[in-house]
A protein has these predicted regions:
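Predominantly soluble domains enriched in secretory-pathway, periplasmic, or organellar proteins
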Residues: 1-212
């Protein structure tokens, strides 16, 4: 397929029940359960695509960085996506040497805001919608906390200042326990981090980890 394909799987058997073809290659994905909208980041095109989960029809598309790639210009690329079902908002990491997070209105498919200064290759993204907190991780070894009410960075914490190389690629939240599970593609471990102060609560031995 010159573009890409999104597969719908049976949650019990994992059999493919549907194939949604798209002219652009999808990478990151999320779903807004309230609107039944699938959101896909088209990394190589710096674009996000919205698809109706019921009909599989494309609802719309938004170019997030329209700069033309050259030897000196490298458009930011969408990586991870999370949807806030309570506000119909989609957050998308735009990775590069100076990364951003795009804030997209799910109803209009328009860019509402751009959160800048999220670090080098800030790939990881997780949302605590109830607390209005968005978290991202980056290749600078940081955990960055953002207030979704204002789209402002509240804090940035260097998780481990141990002289080793760290690239915190992804994270997943335990909102009840106020913990983040953070993968490190440079070290053989997954970190359990306290979201209140950014301290490391535990290290779980694992091969150089990517997703969590």
């Amino acid at each position: 397929d010159k573009g890409g394909v999104v597969y719908r799987l049976d949650p019990v058997t994992l059999e493919v029940t549907q194939a949604i073809h798209n002219d652009l290659k999808p990478f990151g994905a999320t779903i807004d359960n309230a609107t039944q909208t699938l959101w896909f980041g088209n990394t190589v095109n710096s674009t996000v695509t919205a698809i109706d989960a019921k009909t599989s029809e494309v609802k719309g598309r938004l170019v997030l960085d329209d700069r033309k790639r050259s030897d000196t210009v490298k458009p930011l690329q969408p990586r991870q996506l999370v949807a806030d079902d309570t506000t119909n908002t989609v957050y998308i990491t735009g990775i590069g040497k100076e990364s951003v997070i795009w804030v997209v209105d799910g109803a209009t498919l328009k860019l509402k805001d751009t959160i800048t200064n999220t670090g080098t290759f800030s790939t990881g993204l997780a949302l605590d919608a109830k607390a209005k907190r968005l978290y991202t991780t980056n290749a600078d070894g940081e955990l960055v906390t953002i207030d979704t009410a204002t789209n402002k960075i509240l804090s940035r914490k260097k998780v481990q200042d141990d002289g080793k190389e760290h690239f915190y690629l992804n994270l997943s939240l335990d909102t009840a326990g106020q913990r983040a599970f953070v993968t490190d593609s440079k070290q053989p471990e997954v970190l359990v981090v306290n979201l209140k102060d950014g301290s490391v609560m535990q290290k779980i031995a694992a091969p150089a980890s990517l997703a969590v």
